[in-house]
Amino acid sequence: MLNKQNKLYLQAQAYWDFLRIEKQVSPHTLTNYQRQLLAISEMLIAAQIDDWQAVDASVVRWILTQSHKQGLGAKSIGLRLVVLRQWFAYLVQRHYVKVNPAVGIKAPKVARHLPKNIDAERMGQLLDVEVDEPADIRDLAMMELMYSSGLRLAELQRLDLGDMDLIDAEVRLLGKGNKERIVPIGSRALTALQAWLTVRPSFNPQDNALFLNKRGGRLSHRSIQLAMQKWGERQGLATRLHPHKLRHSFATHLLEASTDLRAVQELLGHSSLSTTQIYTHLDFQHLAKIYDASHPRARRKRED
Protein backbone atom coordinates (compact mmCIF):
# COMPACT_ATOMS: atom_id res chain seq x y z
CA MET A 1 0.00 0.00 0.00
CA LEU A 2 1.24 3.46 -0.85
CA ASN A 3 1.65 6.02 1.87
CA LYS A 4 -1.48 8.05 2.62
CA GLN A 5 0.56 11.21 2.05
CA ASN A 6 0.15 11.15 -1.72
CA LYS A 7 -0.94 14.19 -3.68
CA LEU A 8 -4.33 12.84 -4.73
CA TYR A 9 -5.32 11.78 -1.23
CA LEU A 10 -4.07 15.02 0.31
CA GLN A 11 -6.34 16.98 -2.02
CA ALA A 12 -9.31 15.32 -0.34
CA GLN A 13 -8.58 16.52 3.20
CA ALA A 14 -10.98 19.47 3.01
CA TYR A 15 -13.59 17.11 1.57
CA TRP A 16 -13.72 15.13 4.82
CA ASP A 17 -14.66 18.29 6.73
CA PHE A 18 -17.30 19.03 4.09
CA LEU A 19 -18.84 15.56 4.52
CA ARG A 20 -18.68 15.64 8.30
CA ILE A 21 -19.85 19.22 8.90
CA GLU A 22 -22.03 20.19 5.94
CA LYS A 23 -23.38 16.80 4.87
CA GLN A 24 -23.37 15.43 8.44
CA VAL A 25 -22.54 11.91 7.32
CA SER A 26 -22.08 9.24 9.97
CA PRO A 27 -18.57 8.27 11.13
CA HIS A 28 -19.09 4.89 9.45
CA THR A 29 -19.91 6.52 6.09
CA LEU A 30 -16.98 8.91 6.42
CA THR A 31 -14.59 6.02 7.06
CA ASN A 32 -15.95 4.16 4.03
CA TYR A 33 -15.45 7.21 1.80
CA GLN A 34 -11.91 7.71 3.08
CA ARG A 35 -11.06 4.06 2.53
CA GLN A 36 -12.47 4.08 -1.00
CA LEU A 37 -10.82 7.33 -2.05
CA LEU A 38 -7.49 6.15 -0.65
CA ALA A 39 -7.72 2.94 -2.70
CA ILE A 40 -8.66 4.91 -5.82
CA SER A 41 -5.84 7.42 -5.35
CA GLU A 42 -3.31 4.62 -4.89
CA MET A 43 -4.57 2.98 -8.07
CA LEU A 44 -4.17 6.25 -9.99
CA ILE A 45 -0.72 7.01 -8.55
CA ALA A 46 0.41 3.52 -9.60
CA ALA A 47 -0.81 4.37 -13.11
CA GLN A 48 1.18 7.64 -12.93
CA ILE A 49 -1.92 9.84 -12.74
CA ASP A 50 -1.24 12.42 -10.04
CA ASP A 51 -3.96 15.01 -10.62
CA TRP A 52 -7.73 14.63 -10.41
CA GLN A 53 -8.02 16.92 -13.44
CA ALA A 54 -6.49 14.13 -15.51
CA VAL A 55 -9.33 11.74 -14.66
CA ASP A 56 -11.93 11.47 -17.42
CA ALA A 57 -14.71 8.96 -18.11
CA SER A 58 -12.30 6.43 -19.61
CA VAL A 59 -10.17 6.55 -16.46
CA VAL A 60 -13.25 6.05 -14.30
CA ARG A 61 -14.15 2.95 -16.34
CA TRP A 62 -10.56 1.74 -15.96
CA ILE A 63 -10.81 2.17 -12.17
CA LEU A 64 -13.95 0.02 -12.11
CA THR A 65 -12.33 -2.62 -14.35
CA GLN A 66 -9.22 -2.74 -12.17
CA SER A 67 -11.40 -3.01 -9.07
CA HIS A 68 -13.09 -6.04 -10.59
CA LYS A 69 -9.72 -7.61 -11.41
CA GLN A 70 -8.70 -7.08 -7.78
CA GLY A 71 -11.63 -9.26 -6.73
CA LEU A 72 -14.17 -6.65 -5.66
CA GLY A 73 -17.80 -7.65 -6.00
CA ALA A 74 -20.50 -5.68 -7.76
CA LYS A 75 -21.68 -4.04 -4.54
CA SER A 76 -18.19 -2.82 -3.60
CA ILE A 77 -17.55 -1.55 -7.12
CA GLY A 78 -20.88 0.25 -7.03
CA LEU A 79 -19.87 1.92 -3.78
CA ARG A 80 -16.55 2.94 -5.31
CA LEU A 81 -18.41 4.57 -8.21
CA VAL A 82 -20.72 6.42 -5.82
CA VAL A 83 -17.71 7.76 -3.91
CA LEU A 84 -16.08 8.89 -7.16
CA ARG A 85 -19.27 10.56 -8.33
CA GLN A 86 -19.72 12.43 -5.05
CA TRP A 87 -16.06 13.43 -4.90
CA PHE A 88 -16.09 14.87 -8.41
CA ALA A 89 -19.37 16.66 -7.72
CA TYR A 90 -17.51 18.37 -4.88
CA LEU A 91 -14.58 19.23 -7.18
CA VAL A 92 -16.96 20.70 -9.77
CA GLN A 93 -18.63 22.75 -7.06
CA ARG A 94 -15.21 24.05 -6.00
CA HIS A 95 -14.33 24.82 -9.67
CA TYR A 96 -11.33 22.48 -9.59
CA VAL A 97 -12.69 20.44 -12.52
CA LYS A 98 -15.22 21.46 -15.15
CA VAL A 99 -17.19 18.23 -15.51
CA ASN A 100 -17.93 15.17 -13.42
CA PRO A 101 -16.41 12.20 -15.31
CA ALA A 102 -18.32 9.65 -13.22
CA VAL A 103 -21.75 10.91 -14.28
CA GLY A 104 -23.47 8.60 -16.75
CA ILE A 105 -21.31 5.58 -15.95
CA LYS A 106 -23.42 2.68 -14.75
CA ALA A 107 -22.49 0.55 -11.79
CA PRO A 108 -22.54 -3.23 -12.19
CA LYS A 109 -25.82 -4.84 -11.22
CA VAL A 110 -25.91 -6.32 -7.75
CA ALA A 111 -27.81 -9.52 -7.08
CA ARG A 112 -30.12 -8.82 -4.17
CA HIS A 113 -30.10 -11.44 -1.45
CA LEU A 114 -32.53 -10.59 1.32
CA PRO A 115 -31.86 -12.36 4.62
CA LYS A 116 -34.26 -15.12 5.51
CA ASN A 117 -36.84 -13.92 7.96
CA ILE A 118 -37.69 -15.64 11.23
CA ASP A 119 -41.27 -16.90 11.23
CA ALA A 120 -43.70 -15.39 13.74
CA GLU A 121 -43.83 -18.50 15.92
CA ARG A 122 -40.06 -18.77 16.16
CA MET A 123 -39.85 -15.04 16.80
CA GLY A 124 -42.17 -15.50 19.76
CA GLN A 125 -39.91 -18.22 21.15
CA LEU A 126 -36.90 -15.97 20.64
CA LEU A 127 -38.39 -13.00 22.47
CA ASP A 128 -40.75 -14.55 25.04
CA VAL A 129 -37.94 -15.01 27.55
CA GLU A 130 -37.85 -14.14 31.25
CA VAL A 131 -34.81 -12.00 32.00
CA ASP A 132 -33.36 -10.67 35.27
CA GLU A 133 -29.88 -9.38 34.44
CA PRO A 134 -29.83 -5.67 33.47
CA ALA A 135 -27.83 -6.37 30.29
CA ASP A 136 -30.35 -9.02 29.23
CA ILE A 137 -33.23 -6.64 29.96
CA ARG A 138 -31.51 -4.09 27.73
CA ASP A 139 -30.89 -6.58 24.93
CA LEU A 140 -34.48 -7.82 25.00
CA ALA A 141 -35.73 -4.22 24.80
CA MET A 142 -33.50 -3.56 21.78
CA MET A 143 -34.73 -6.64 19.93
CA GLU A 144 -38.38 -6.09 20.78
CA LEU A 145 -38.11 -2.51 19.52
CA MET A 146 -36.35 -3.48 16.31
CA TYR A 147 -38.90 -6.17 15.53
CA SER A 148 -41.83 -4.09 16.73
CA SER A 149 -41.01 -1.02 14.67
CA GLY A 150 -38.68 -2.13 11.88
CA LEU A 151 -35.67 -0.06 12.90
CA ARG A 152 -32.37 -0.05 11.08
CA LEU A 153 -29.30 -0.77 13.21
CA ALA A 154 -28.09 2.84 12.86
CA GLU A 155 -31.51 4.16 13.88
CA LEU A 156 -31.53 2.01 17.00
CA GLN A 157 -27.95 2.90 17.90
CA ARG A 158 -28.49 6.66 17.76
CA LEU A 159 -31.73 6.71 19.78
CA ASP A 160 -31.83 9.13 22.70
CA LEU A 161 -34.25 9.13 25.62
CA GLY A 162 -36.05 12.12 24.13
CA ASP A 163 -36.90 10.17 20.98
CA MET A 164 -39.26 7.90 22.92
CA ASP A 165 -42.89 8.76 23.62
CA LEU A 166 -44.06 5.95 25.87
CA ILE A 167 -47.44 7.59 26.52
CA ASP A 168 -48.45 7.61 22.85
CA ALA A 169 -46.31 4.52 22.11
CA GLU A 170 -44.27 6.19 19.37
CA VAL A 171 -40.60 6.56 18.57
CA ARG A 172 -38.98 9.29 16.47
CA LEU A 173 -36.29 7.98 14.14
CA LEU A 174 -33.59 9.67 12.12
CA GLY A 175 -33.12 7.51 9.05
CA LYS A 176 -30.93 7.61 5.97
CA GLY A 177 -30.21 11.09 4.71
CA ASN A 178 -31.23 12.49 8.11
CA LYS A 179 -34.89 11.95 7.21
CA GLU A 180 -37.11 11.85 10.26
CA ARG A 181 -40.11 9.58 10.69
CA ILE A 182 -42.33 8.53 13.58
CA VAL A 183 -43.37 4.90 13.98
CA PRO A 184 -45.59 3.12 16.50
CA ILE A 185 -44.31 0.83 19.24
CA GLY A 186 -46.12 -2.44 19.97
CA SER A 187 -47.24 -3.37 23.47
CA ARG A 188 -44.60 -6.09 23.92
CA ALA A 189 -41.83 -3.68 22.96
CA LEU A 190 -43.34 -1.00 25.18
CA THR A 191 -43.27 -3.35 28.17
CA ALA A 192 -39.67 -4.33 27.43
CA LEU A 193 -38.63 -0.68 27.11
CA GLN A 194 -40.27 0.23 30.40
CA ALA A 195 -38.39 -2.63 32.08
CA TRP A 196 -35.13 -1.38 30.59
CA LEU A 197 -35.74 2.21 31.68
CA THR A 198 -36.24 0.93 35.23
CA VAL A 199 -32.75 -0.61 35.36
CA ARG A 200 -30.98 1.88 33.07
CA PRO A 201 -29.79 4.07 36.00
CA SER A 202 -27.70 1.13 37.25
CA PHE A 203 -25.48 1.59 34.16
CA ASN A 204 -24.38 5.01 35.48
CA PRO A 205 -25.54 6.95 32.39
CA GLN A 206 -23.02 9.40 30.95
CA ASP A 207 -25.33 10.84 28.28
CA ASN A 208 -28.89 10.69 26.93
CA ALA A 209 -28.38 7.58 24.80
CA LEU A 210 -31.29 5.18 25.19
CA PHE A 211 -29.18 2.02 25.15
CA LEU A 212 -25.98 2.03 27.21
CA ASN A 213 -22.88 -0.09 27.58
CA LYS A 214 -21.51 -1.14 30.96
CA ARG A 215 -19.51 2.11 31.20
CA GLY A 216 -22.63 4.22 30.79
CA GLY A 217 -21.87 5.33 27.24
CA ARG A 218 -23.80 4.77 24.04
CA LEU A 219 -23.70 1.22 22.71
CA SER A 220 -21.73 0.90 19.47
CA HIS A 221 -23.07 -0.73 16.31
CA ARG A 222 -20.74 -3.68 16.85
CA SER A 223 -21.80 -4.16 20.47
CA ILE A 224 -25.45 -4.32 19.41
CA GLN A 225 -24.64 -6.86 16.70
CA LEU A 226 -22.69 -9.05 19.14
CA ALA A 227 -25.40 -8.83 21.80
CA MET A 228 -28.04 -10.03 19.35
CA GLN A 229 -25.81 -12.74 17.96
CA LYS A 230 -25.18 -14.12 21.46
CA TRP A 231 -28.89 -13.93 22.27
CA GLY A 232 -29.74 -16.00 19.21
CA GLU A 233 -27.12 -18.58 20.13
CA ARG A 234 -28.46 -18.86 23.70
CA GLN A 235 -31.98 -19.36 22.40
CA GLY A 236 -30.86 -22.09 20.02
CA LEU A 237 -31.48 -20.18 16.79
CA ALA A 238 -30.13 -22.25 13.91
CA THR A 239 -28.93 -19.23 11.93
CA ARG A 240 -27.00 -16.18 13.03
CA LEU A 241 -29.22 -13.47 14.50
CA HIS A 242 -28.30 -10.01 13.31
CA PRO A 243 -30.20 -6.71 13.49
CA HIS A 244 -31.29 -6.58 9.87
CA LYS A 245 -32.91 -9.99 10.22
CA LEU A 246 -35.28 -8.48 12.79
CA ARG A 247 -36.09 -5.58 10.46
CA HIS A 248 -36.61 -7.97 7.56
CA SER A 249 -38.88 -10.17 9.69
CA PHE A 250 -40.86 -7.08 10.70
CA ALA A 251 -41.43 -6.22 7.04
CA THR A 252 -42.22 -9.78 5.99
CA HIS A 253 -44.75 -10.43 8.75
CA LEU A 254 -46.56 -7.15 8.12
CA LEU A 255 -46.68 -7.76 4.38
CA GLU A 256 -48.05 -11.25 4.95
CA ALA A 257 -50.93 -9.83 6.98
CA SER A 258 -51.51 -6.42 5.40
CA THR A 259 -52.93 -5.46 2.02
CA ASP A 260 -51.49 -1.94 2.28
CA LEU A 261 -48.01 -2.19 0.83
CA ARG A 262 -47.35 1.54 0.93
CA ALA A 263 -48.07 1.72 4.66
CA VAL A 264 -45.47 -0.95 5.34
CA GLN A 265 -42.98 0.77 3.06
CA GLU A 266 -43.44 4.07 4.87
CA LEU A 267 -42.99 2.39 8.23
CA LEU A 268 -39.67 1.08 6.92
CA GLY A 269 -38.62 4.58 5.85
CA HIS A 270 -37.67 3.65 2.29
CA SER A 271 -36.77 6.92 0.56
CA SER A 272 -37.02 5.32 -2.89
CA LEU A 273 -40.82 5.45 -2.56
CA SER A 274 -40.98 9.24 -2.39
CA THR A 275 -42.47 9.43 -5.88
CA THR A 276 -45.32 7.12 -4.91
CA GLN A 277 -45.97 9.10 -1.75
CA ILE A 278 -46.61 12.24 -3.82
CA TYR A 279 -49.79 10.61 -5.07
CA THR A 280 -50.84 8.85 -1.89
CA HIS A 281 -50.01 10.59 1.38
CA LEU A 282 -50.20 8.29 4.37
CA ASP A 283 -50.66 10.04 7.69
CA PHE A 284 -49.48 8.57 10.96
CA GLN A 285 -52.97 7.60 12.17
CA HIS A 286 -53.42 5.44 9.09
CA LEU A 287 -50.00 3.85 9.55
CA ALA A 288 -50.80 3.09 13.19
CA LYS A 289 -54.10 1.47 12.19
CA ILE A 290 -52.37 -0.77 9.65
CA TYR A 291 -49.69 -1.56 12.23
CA ASP A 292 -52.16 -2.52 14.97
CA ALA A 293 -54.11 -4.76 12.63
CA SER A 294 -51.10 -6.49 11.10
CA HIS A 295 -48.14 -6.86 13.46
CA PRO A 296 -48.18 -10.13 15.43
CA ARG A 297 -46.84 -8.46 18.58
CA ALA A 298 -48.63 -5.12 18.35
CA ARG A 299 -52.00 -5.09 20.14
CA ARG A 300 -51.17 -1.67 21.50
CA LYS A 301 -54.79 -0.85 22.38
CA ARG A 302 -56.26 -2.38 25.49
CA GLU A 303 -59.56 -4.17 25.21
CA ASP A 304 -62.04 -2.86 27.78
From Swiss-Prot:
The active site is at 152, 176, 244, 247, 270, 279 (o-(3'-phospho-dna)-tyrosine intermediate). Residues 113-292 form the Tyr recombinase domain. Keywords: Cell cycle, Cell division, Chromosome partition, Cytoplasm, DNA integration, DNA recombination, DNA-binding. It holds the Pfam family Phage_integrase. The keyword Cell division applies. GO terms for molecular function: DNA binding; tyrosine-based site-specific recombinase activity. Its main location: cytoplasm. Residues 6-92 form the Core-binding (CB) domain. One of its GO terms (biological process) is DNA transposition. Transmembrane segments: none annotated. It is found in: Cytoplasm. GO terms for cellular component: cytoplasm. InterPro entries: CB, DNA_brk_join_enz, Integrase-like_cat_sf, Integrase_catalytic, Integrase_recombinase_N, Integrase_SAM-like_N, Recomb_XerC, Tyrosine_recombinase_XerC/XerD. Forms a cyclic heterotetrameric complex composed of two molecules of XerC and two molecules of XerD. Site-specific tyrosine recombinase, which acts by catalyzing the cutting and rejoining of the recombining DNA molecules. The XerC-XerD complex is essential to convert dimers of the bacterial chromosome into monomers to permit their segregation at cell division. It also contributes to the segregational stability of plasmids. Belongs to the 'phage' integrase family. XerC subfamily. This is Tyrosine recombinase XerC.
